[in-house]
Curated annotation (Swiss-Prot):
The encoding gene: uspB
NCBIfam families tied to this protein: PRK04960.1 (NF003435)
Descriptive protein name: Universal stress protein B
UniProt keyword Disulfide bond present: no
Organism: Photorhabdus laumondii subsp. laumondii (strain DSM 15139 / CIP 105565 / TT01) (Photorhabdus luminescens subsp. laumondii)
Keyword annotations of the record: Cell inner membrane, Cell membrane, Membrane, Transmembrane, Transmembrane helix
Length: 111
């Protein structure tokens, strides 16, 4: 028999690791955008993206750019590759976060 609490914490750990991978990939994408597409880099607030004074609407602009797959028309294949990877990581992290919330709710009901 397995412990549901241990399973929950293992799932939380996997979710946190995937979030760290996602943010690391986002940093790599921003550094590539700085060199290959400075206009896009400025429009998504590249310098202030991970700061406390970052502009949320510009950060959401990058998320929409990736989720709507507008990067497919980009001239740099490295940007296309990184955006596709980032999109898949976002879907995975969102799914895992939803699963953690569902597990937490079910544990609260169960116990």
């Amino acid at each position: 028999m397995f412990s549901t609490i241990a399973l929950f914490w293992a799932l939380c750990l996997v979710c946190i690791i995937n979030m760290m991978r996602y943010f690391s990939s986002l940093r790599a994408l921003l550094s590539i955008l700085r060199q290959s597409d400075p206009l896009l880099y400025q429009s998504v607030d590249g310098n202030g993206f991970f700061t406390t004074h970052g502009q949320l609407n510009k950060q959401i602009r990058l998320v929409n750019y990736i989720n709507s797959q507008r990067y497919l028309d980009h001239h740099d294949p490295e940007v296309v590759l990184r955006c596709e990877r980032l999109r898949k990581q976002f879907i995975l992290t969102s799914s895992l976060s939803g699963l953690v919330v569902i597990c937490l709710i079910s544990m609260l009901i169960w116990y």
